[in-house]
């Protein structure tokens, strides 16, 4: 593609470049207007509407040309500089916006709002909206199954953080507070599309955010905002204004000053991008760490909940679960999956609702009929948000009207006994006035945009009907006029016609020009014809064109009136959207449970994970798809007496699959889904921690072993007796002795101190001795058997430790050359013989001498009592002198 003029080596200075004065008087009037608008959006690409194109200038043009592969050119001069520009057609705006947003860019849309020629100078323009990755509302830019989430992070004193986030299309502000160390877990949970934070954060906090970005936890654009926007008092006032309340007590959000500060910046930024108040934001939800089951970033990654280890959307647990008929249902189902609650109330309610949809208590079940009814339902949630923001398109209103009618039918046809389903049924009833307004106001097949006309239904407005009548009778008038003029002039091929450039005219070929009457006035000369206008035709033209313009203006005004009337229905429409989404998600859970043969879990008050015939849901589905055989189910029994399994066995035997399936079954049960097992009984769970796999983090200069130890340390600090911990091959990233020693220490700590439910897979057979020395640990292994020179993996979890590893057999299956295998067999025999002749084995699990336990030095004790963010300069200096005195010998 032609890239236009190459300006890379001879760039003209941008008028907005640093150091250039803000005086634009030397520029042309058009460029003065552009530069004044651009000054308000220095870090944003400004799409400046000029006729049928959106133009970009100078640095914006160069950047857009590079990112979008569009032509970069120069046209004319302004203030003595060539005007560097690039443009895109207005009708292709959404396509280019989508590409830029996916690249993490933000775009300000500048439209012509004044009438051309109405005033001296350039037509009036203004920025009508700013499109950023975290504030998307356009259905063309948003994926059906994902939210565009904006997150504001406020760094507070004493290593605390305030978090506030929202999806503009949902209209709910979420609040949370956490420590600096917990920010990564919260970001992984929220999955933001854009993060804003204060320009006044400390260097260390900035480095932490960048580290999260480089590590893949934070994979979205970061935007700095002025420090003054993060004001707690301002945030509290803004929240009260949105809620129309005098107190935040009803939402349990009154004592969250740090989160209030984040919400101040969040709401200001969101309003700035939409160009108006967010009137549809009607709720605040406070999220607390102790309410949710913790799923750290490593857990989400290793369990492949929504993304595979290769970064693909499927096959994952969510891709297997999601058979929803609507985008709303898919998004809600993902939220249930990624935000399971420790309290079982919601999970029990979903299981009970699913049971009725399945027909477990008698009857045929209603899930199939409901899924058929939900097919083709529009995205009410996003349409409602666009109504509130006055951005909704006519065809979206038609789709909304049809969906509301369908929702009424669903509610009328089903009478559920389950409380959750009964509540959903009640919310499906939208106000009758809303449906009547939509049906009466909008044509069944309207134009795509209001500016094109053809949107308001006939009979809705008498004045519009009259104006349309004038336009609709144009053809009759023109035909009658043509007939009369032919008779009057005796010109047989005379034609009365219309085009957008010249309006109405009478066309006469050159051979009949001698018959032209005196009242014909020449309008245009063609090669073989002349075009004329008469006083009568001119009068009709004025009337018809005036009617067309007035009708279009009337339609625009009426459309705005319809939006005004719809505002009162936004809360009810929001409830209807939530009800449709919940019903869709529950039907998907019902369908999956029946299709895949899953069972309903049971919840217990005492600590336990009891699974009979458990299967890995994704692996089982893949085996079924590829006809690769049946999945081998396994049992798991962890309780107060058995808290740890030491898992040994060959590679490819299924250790990792078994561990993951236990975690996935626990997660599915906790979200309120049936589970892939014959029976499941689950006690309280507060977190799922995993350390699986090995890979260098080159971006952060961390080796495989460093990554391994970092994740292990995080688990050892965070896990509790109610946590599920998966440890796979810990210690393999270093030498054998170091790895074995560390693995034994970690296993002992998890057993003796943490007391978490632990699945500990290892190739260190020495670790199997732990079960003999520790009452709450047991040995299990994945079965394998030899058949001649071959090995058969049974994929069964069997009691006791493995007898051998079969590593050389696995190497042969992988295609390692025969000479290498022969050498390995010889070396293995020699090593085993030497081991048998060696000294008595070291006791890995003997407690270390008390004297070896490091104490806390006076300097360390003093450091623990210092909170840098809360110190004044004088206090910091005093603390430094105190540390120096403590560090001096003697």
Curated annotation (Swiss-Prot):
InterPro entries: DNA_mismatch_repair_MutS, DNA_mismatch_repair_MutS-lik_N, DNA_mismatch_repair_MutS/MSH, DNA_mismatch_repair_MutS_C, DNA_mismatch_repair_MutS_clamp, DNA_mismatch_repair_MutS_core, DNA_mismatch_repair_MutS_N, DNA_mismatch_repair_MutS_sf
GO molecular function: ATP binding; ATP-dependent DNA damage sensor activity; damaged DNA binding; mismatched DNA binding
One Pfam short name: MutS_II
Extent of Basic and acidic residues compositional bias: 1-13
UniProt GO cellular component terms: cytosol
SMART domains: MUTSac (SM00534), MUTSd (SM00533)
Claim: DNA-binding is one of the keywords in the record: yes
Region span, Disordered: 1-23
Record keywords, A-Z: ATP-binding, DNA damage, DNA repair, DNA-binding, Nucleotide-binding
Residues at which ATP binds: 649-656
Classification via PANTHER family: DNA MISMATCH REPAIR PROTEIN MSH1, MITOCHONDRIAL (PTHR11361:SF34), DNA MISMATCH REPAIR PROTEIN MUTS FAMILY MEMBER (PTHR11361)
Purpose of the protein: This protein is involved in the repair of mismatches in DNA. It is possible that it carries out the mismatch recognition step. This protein has a weak ATPase activity.
Protein name (database record): DNA mismatch repair protein MutS
């Amino acid at each position: 593609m032609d890239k236009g003029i190459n300006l890379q080596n001879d760039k003209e200075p941008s008028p907005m470049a640093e150091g250039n004065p803000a005086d634009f008087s030397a520029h042309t009037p058009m460029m003065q207007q552009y530069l004044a608008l651009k000054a308000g959006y220095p870090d944003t690409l400004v799409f400046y509407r000029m006729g049928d194109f959106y133009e970009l200038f100078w640095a914006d043009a160069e950047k857009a040309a590079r990112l979008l592969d569009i032509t970069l050119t120069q046209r004319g001069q302004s203030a003595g500089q060539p005007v560097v520009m690039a443009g895109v057609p207005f009708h292709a705006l959404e396509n280019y916006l989508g590409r830029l947003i996916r690249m993490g860019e933000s775009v300000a849309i500048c439209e012509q709002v004044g009438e051309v020629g109405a005033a001296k100078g350039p037509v009036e323009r203004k920025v009508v909206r700013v499109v950023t990755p975290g504030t998307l509302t356009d259905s063309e830019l948003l994926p059906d199954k994902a939210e565009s989430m904006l997150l504001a992070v406020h760094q507070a004193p004493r290593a605390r953080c305030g978090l506030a986030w929202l999806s503009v299309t949902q209209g709910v502000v979420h609040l949370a507070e956490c420590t600096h160390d917990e920010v990564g877990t919260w970001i992984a949970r929220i999955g933001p599309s854009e993060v804003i934070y204060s320009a006044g954060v400390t260097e260390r906090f900035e480095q932490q955010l960048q580290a999260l970005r480089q590590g893949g936890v934070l994979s979205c654009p970061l935007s700095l905002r002025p420090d003054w926007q993060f004001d707690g008092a301002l945030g509290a006032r803004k929240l009260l204004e949105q809620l129309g309340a005098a107190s935040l007590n009803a939402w349990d959000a009154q004592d969250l000053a740090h989160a209030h500060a984040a919400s101040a910046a969040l709401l200001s930024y969101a309003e700035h991008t939409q160009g108006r108040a967010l009137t549809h934001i009607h709720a605040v939800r406070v999220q607390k760490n102790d309410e949710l089951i913790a799923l750290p970033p490593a857990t989400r990654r290793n369990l492949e909940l929504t993304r595979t280890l290769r970064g693909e959307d499927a096959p994952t647990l969510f891709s297997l679960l999601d058979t929803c008929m609507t985008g709303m249902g898919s998004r809600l189902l993902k939220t249930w999956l990624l935000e399971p609650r420790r309290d079982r109330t919601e999970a029990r309610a979903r299981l009970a609702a699913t049971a009725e949809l399945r027909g477990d208590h008698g009857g045929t079940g209603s899930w199939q009929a409901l899924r058929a009814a939900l097919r083709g339902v529009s995205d009410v949630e996003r349409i409602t948000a666009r109504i509130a923001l006055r951005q909704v398109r006519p065809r979206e209103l038609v789709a909304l009207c049809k969906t509301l009618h369908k929702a009424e039918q669903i509610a009328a046809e089903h009478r559920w006994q389950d409380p959750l389903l009964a509540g959903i049924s009640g919310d499906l009833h939208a106000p009758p006035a809303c449906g009547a307004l939509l049906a009466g106001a909008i044509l069944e097949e309207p134009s795509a945009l209001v500016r094109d006309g053809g949107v308001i239904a006939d009979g809705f407005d008498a004045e519009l009907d009259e104006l349309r009548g004038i336009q609709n009778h144009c053809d009759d008038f023109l035909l009658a006029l043509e007939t009369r003029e032919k008779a009057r002039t005796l010109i047989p091929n005379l034609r009365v016609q219309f085009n957008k450039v010249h309006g109405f005219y009478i066309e006469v070929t050159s051979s009949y020009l001698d018959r032209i009457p005196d009242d014909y006035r020449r309008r245009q000369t063609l090669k073989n014809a002349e075009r004329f206008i008469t006083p009568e035709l001119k009068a009709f033209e004025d009337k018809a064109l005036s009617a067309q313009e007035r009708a279009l203006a009337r339609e625009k005004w009426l459309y705005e009136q319809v939006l005004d009337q719809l505002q009162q229905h936004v809360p009810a429409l929001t409830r209807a959207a939530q009800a449709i989404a919940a019903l869709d998600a529950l039907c998907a859970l019902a369908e999956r449970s029946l299709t895949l043969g899953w069972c309903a879990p049971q919840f217990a008050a005492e600590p336990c994970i009891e699974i009979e015939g458990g299967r890995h849901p994704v692996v089982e589905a893949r085996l079924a798809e590829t006809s690769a055989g049946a999945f081998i189910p396994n049992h798991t029994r962890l309780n107060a007496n058995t808290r740890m399994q030491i898992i040994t066995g060959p590679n490819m035997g299924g250790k990792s699959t078994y561990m993951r399936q236990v975690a996935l079954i626990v997660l599915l049960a906790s979200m309120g889904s049936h589970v892939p097992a014959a029976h499941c009984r689950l006690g309280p769970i507060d977190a799922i921690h995993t350390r699986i796999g090995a890979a260098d983090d080159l971006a952060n200069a961390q080796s495989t072993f460093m990554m391994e130890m970092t994740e292990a340390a995080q688990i050892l600090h965070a896990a509790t007796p109610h946590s599920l911990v998966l440890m796979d091959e810990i210690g393999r990233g270093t030498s054998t002795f170091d790895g074995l020693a560390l693995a034994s220490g970690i296993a002992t700590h998890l057993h003796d101190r943490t007391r978490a439910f632990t699945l500990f897979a290892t190739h260190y057979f020495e670790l199997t001795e732990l079960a003999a020395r520790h009452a709450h640990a047991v040995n299990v292994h994945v079965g394998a058997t030899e058949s001649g020179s071959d090995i058969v993996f049974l994929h069964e979890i069997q009691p006791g430790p493995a007898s051998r590893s079969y590593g050389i057999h696995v190497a042969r299956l992988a295609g390692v050359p025969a000479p290498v295998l022969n050498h390995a067999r010889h070396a293995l025999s020699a090593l085993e013989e030497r081991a048998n002749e060696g000294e008595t084995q070291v006791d890995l699990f003997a407690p270390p001498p008390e004297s070896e336990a490091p104490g806390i030095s006076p300097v360390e004790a003093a450091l623990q009592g210092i909170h840098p963010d809360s110190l004044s300069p004088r206090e910091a200096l005093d603390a430094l002198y105190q540390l120096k005195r403590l560090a001096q010998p003697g």
